Structures are given as structure tokens and as C-alpha cells.
């Protein structure tokens, strides 16, 4: 049987095959076809219960949900999108919950979205360069410099002397070169970008990169050096074994297709026992004799003698490695240097100029905010004001001051439903640096009464000022070495709020 429609709806009105004019009909019926001229109350083609089943009529309107939500700390279009998405999901389901349940579901989704909004966090983990918490906090002067250029125009690419267009970051690059003991330096937007730029440049005509198998490391987030190199268009020529690589291994691998030798500093792990790898000086001599560029990726980017800070292990500096014969070095700006996320490359003036002429360089260059913060950080390092860099200040904080702060925090919590005491901790530099070094620290150890530790920990993370700590031996531990003294009051308030949070907020 072929069913032919005798009426159809256009722009809100029903048209009939028997009439050249729209025939609007208002009826007592319900559904999309209420005004169909074929019926006063129901459509024979689409029954009312099929078009608008009874279960769908209990779904609240978008406007009703928005009014019930009240004020939400999100842009209204984002809130509207979430509400519409949730209501659409209900329409596809088999059952529709009550209005209060629907409202709570929407609030839960909005809260999950809001928690991902970037904001300050109290770091009580004892990991100073915590990758998940943003690595190095900026020095106050660097933060001020960033804010100053963010709110105003700046001389990003103008020569204020003559008024013509000038070079980007020329002041920063000049001082970076001084800090690294190099002829020249430049900066891109992160450490991996620096390595990619170097590899793309040196393998444009000769595609092979010679690298030891013991240095094919994996960095944070599951990213692996071999994958990064291959994504750059290079072909890896692996030499040696995981624990044993000799200079002869490098020599035998070098050939007409060799574009560069790459040495990767194992900054996020260490090997001991039956291990061997040639020092930088020997690889540099071999590279010069073969006329092959030699690049060393330092990763963490120390610019000072780390062994003089709290008994840390030695971390090679850019100046040290260049002095040992490496052609170029690259490292991150937001680790031991204490600046913003950036990738720094230092070496001969001719090589740096060639890198900056690469078309790919423009895709990696930094904006004014990063340049302003990094410029101030480098200036402080050159001036010997490293004590103003937060991470270095943390490393040098004495135990007595940490104990004093812990006792004051405990005193402020005396009437709260918890057990709290001063504990011992072991802080780490983190961020893939100094893997063998730890620093004795002081913790505030909390047992939150009858509240489960996981619930207490989650409430702290979801509070107005999020607090991240660790659970060890049935205690929640907050390492004060990574908590700034200016955060102590907020820390106390966050702990109190977590203890008294209303049920259902978790």
C-alpha cells in the first residue's frame, strides 16, 4: 500500500493539495501535527503518542533548567550547551527521571567541566617541578613582567631607536647566549620543539640520526624520543645496547647518510652496574673528525652548579657541555631554569642563524608572554639572584622554618575533628630531573576523623582552593617544602572546608 500525504507543513502552516493557500488550523490536539486539516485532534499518519510519547512530556524545558541552576561560573553558551546535551540524552533514553534528578545530573556535568578550568593549586606533594601541576612556578618579577606586557602593547618586533621593524627576542637571545656560554641562542615554545627543529634542520639532506640505544628515553605523557625523531622525518641509526655503548659503536654507524649525532641526557632516570657510554668530549672529537654535527639534549636545563644546592647530584649545564665540544645544546625553560615553558637552543652563531631561517621555526616561536617571563628569569640568573627563583628557594629552605610553619598550621586546626601532627617527608625535584636526589622535608600529617582518606583527599582537590597531597600509611600528608608560606592560611581554610563539606558534594 502506498500512503500519499494530502497535506504538509511549511513554515508553521499546513498546505492542502486542494488549496493554493495555507490552511492554519488550531486544534485541541497535541504534537507536531496539531493543525493538520485532516483532523481536529489527531493525525491519522502519525499518532500523537508516537510523535510526543507521554514520557517525553516530563522532560523540563531548557529555559526552566537554566532558571533552576542559578548562577554558574561558566560562560552562558557553555551552560546552555551542556543543558541541551543532557536533555537530548534523556529523550533518547527509555526512562525520564524526576526534575530534581535531571537538575542534579546537569549540575554534576557542569561541575566536572568547571574542575578542568586552569586555576592556582596548593602543591603538597613534595615534588617541586610537578609536571601535572605546571612545573616551575615563576619568580614574582617574571610574573610581573608577564602581566605588564599582557595588559599593554610592547616592543615585540619594533626597533624603538629607529622605529622600523626589529628582531623578536633579540635582548633575550643575547643574554641567553651569555648564560649558556655560547656564541648565540634562540628560544622556541617547548623542549620537544627545540629537538624537532634541530633534527629537521640537520636531516634535511642526510636523514640519519645516530643515537645510543641507552638514550631512547620516554618522557612524560607517554611521549618517546624515537617517536619524536621519526615524526621529524629522521631515520634512527641506533648504536650499542641499553647498558653498553662504546665510541667505536658511534664510529661504525657514521656514513654518507648521517645528518647528526644526538646524545640525550638521561635526566629522568639513571642506570648503575655494568654500564658504559662515552663522555661528551670523546663523541665531540669523533663528530669533528667526521664533519658531523653533534647535538646534546640536556632536558632539565641546569644553569648553575646543582651539587652546591642542598647536596643534590651534579647536573650538566649548557656551558659545561658546550665547553666539552658539543656543537649545540637544547633544554627546557620550565625546569631547573625556573622559567615558563620554552625550548632553548644554544651554540655557534652561524648554526643558530640557520635554524631561525627554517620555515618551521616560525611555527614554533614564542609569544610576548613567554618571552617577557623568560627574559626576566634569565636576567635574574645572570645577576646571581637565583634565590628569587621559587624552585631554588624551595631547595634551600631549612628544616627549622618548615617545622615552625607546620606547628602554626596544626595550632590553627586544634578544634577540628581530626588528628594532625608534624611528620617527616622526602621531597623530590621532579619534572624529569635529578632522579637520584631527594631532600629531607617536613609534612603535616592528617587523619580526618571518621572521614575516609580518599573522600577527604577528593574534597581537598575539589575545594575553592584545590590542595593536592599524598596518602601514605593511612595518613594524608602535605609536604610544606612545596607549599608557599603565603598559602598557609588558605591551606588551613581548605582543610576545614573539606572536613565540613556537605554530603553529596564529592
What do the predicted segments below correspond to?
Residues 96-138, 142-145:
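Long amphipathic N-terminal alpha/beta scaffold segment
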Residues 403-486, 490-491:
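Conserved C-terminal alpha-helix-loop-beta "cap" of PLP-dependent enzymes
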Amino acid at each position: 500500500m502506498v500512503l500519499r500525504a494530502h497535506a504538509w507543513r511549511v513554515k508553521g502552516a499546513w498546505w492542502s493539495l486542494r488549496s493554493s493557500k495555507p490552511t492554519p488550523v488550531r486544534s485541541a490536539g497535541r504534537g507536531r501535527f496539531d493543525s493538520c486539516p485532516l483532523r481536529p485532534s489527531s493525525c491519522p499518519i502519525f499518532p500523537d503518542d508516537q510523535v510526543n510519547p507521554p514520557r517525553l512530556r516530563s522532560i523540563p524545558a531548557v529555559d526552566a533548567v537554566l532558571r533552576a541552576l542559578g548562577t554558574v561560573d561558566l560562560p552562558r553558551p557553555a551552560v546552555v550547551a551542556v543543558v541541551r546535551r543532557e536533555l537530548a540524552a534523556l529523550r533518547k533514553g527509555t526512562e525520564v527521571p524526576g526534575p530534581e534528578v535531571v537538575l542534579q545530573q546537569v549540575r554534576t556535568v557542569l561541575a566536572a567541566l568547571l574542575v578542568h578550568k586552569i586555576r592556582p593549586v596548593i602543591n603538597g606533594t613534595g615534588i617541586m617541578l610537578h609536571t601535572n601541576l605546571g612545573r616551575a612556578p615563576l619568580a614574582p618579577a617574571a610574573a610581573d613582567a608577564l602581566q605588564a606586557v599582557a595588559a599593554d602593547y610592547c616592543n615585540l618586533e619594533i626597533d624603538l631607536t629607529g622605529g622600523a621593524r626589529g628582531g623578536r627576542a633579540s635582548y633575550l637571545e643575547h643574554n641567553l647566549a651569555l648564560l649558556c656560554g655560547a656564541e648565540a641562542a634562540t628560544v622556541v615554545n617547548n623542549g620537544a620543539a627545540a629537538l624537532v627543529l634541530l633534527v629537521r634542520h640537520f636531516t634535511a639532506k642526510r636523514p640519519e640520526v645516530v643515537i645510543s640505544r641507552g638514550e631512547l628515553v620516554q618522557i612524560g605523557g607517554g611521549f618517546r624520543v624515537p617517536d619524536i625523531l621519526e615524526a621529524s622525518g629522521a631515520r634512527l641509526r641506533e648504536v650499542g645496547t641499553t647498558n653498553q655503548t662504546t665510541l667505536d659503536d658511534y664510529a661504525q654507524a657514521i656514513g654518507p647518510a648521517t645528518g647528526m649525532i644526538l646524545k640525550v641526557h638521561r635526566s629522568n632516570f639513571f642506570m648503575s652496574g655494568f654500564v658504559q657510554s662515552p663522555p661528551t668530549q670523546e663523541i665531540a672529537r669523533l663528530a669533528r673528525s667526521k664533519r658531523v654535527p653533534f647535538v646534546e639534549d640536556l632536558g632539565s636545563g641546569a644553569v648553575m652548579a646543582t651539587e652546591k644546592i642542598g647536596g643534590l647530584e651534579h647536573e650538566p649545564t649548557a656551558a659545561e657541555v658546550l665547553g666539552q665540544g658539543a656543537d649545540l645544546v637544547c633544554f627546557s625553560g620550565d625546569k631547573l631554569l625556573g622559567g615558563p615553558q620554552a625550548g632553548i637552543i644554544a651554540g655557534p652563531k652561524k648554526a643558530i642563524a640557520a635554524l631561525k631561517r627554517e620555515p618551521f621555526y616560525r611555527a614554533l616561536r614564542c609569544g610576548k608572554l613567554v618571552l617577557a617571563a623568560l627574559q626576566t628569569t634569565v636576567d635574574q640568573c645572570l645577576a646571581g639572584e637565583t634565590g628569587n627563583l621559587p624552585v631554588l628557594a624551595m631547595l634551600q629552605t631549612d628544616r627549622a622554618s618548615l617545622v615552625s610553619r607546620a606547628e602554626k598550621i596544626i595550632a590553627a586546626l586544634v578544634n577540628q575533628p581530626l588528628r594532625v601532627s608534624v611528620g617527616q617527608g622526602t621531597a623530590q625535584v621532579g619534572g624529569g630531573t635529578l632522579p637520584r636526589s631527594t631532600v629531607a622535608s617536613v609534612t603535616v600529617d592528617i587523619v580526618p576523623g571518621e572521614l575516609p582518606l580518599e573522600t577527604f583527599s577528593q574534597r581537598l582537590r575539589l575545594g575553592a582552593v584545590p590542595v593536592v597531597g599524598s596518602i601514605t600509611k593511612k595518613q594524608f600528608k602535605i609536604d610544606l617544602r612545596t607549599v608557599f608560606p603565603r598559602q598557609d592560611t588558605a591551606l588551613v581554610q581548605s582543610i576545614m572546608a573539606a572536613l565540613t563539606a556537605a554530603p553529596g558534594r564529592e
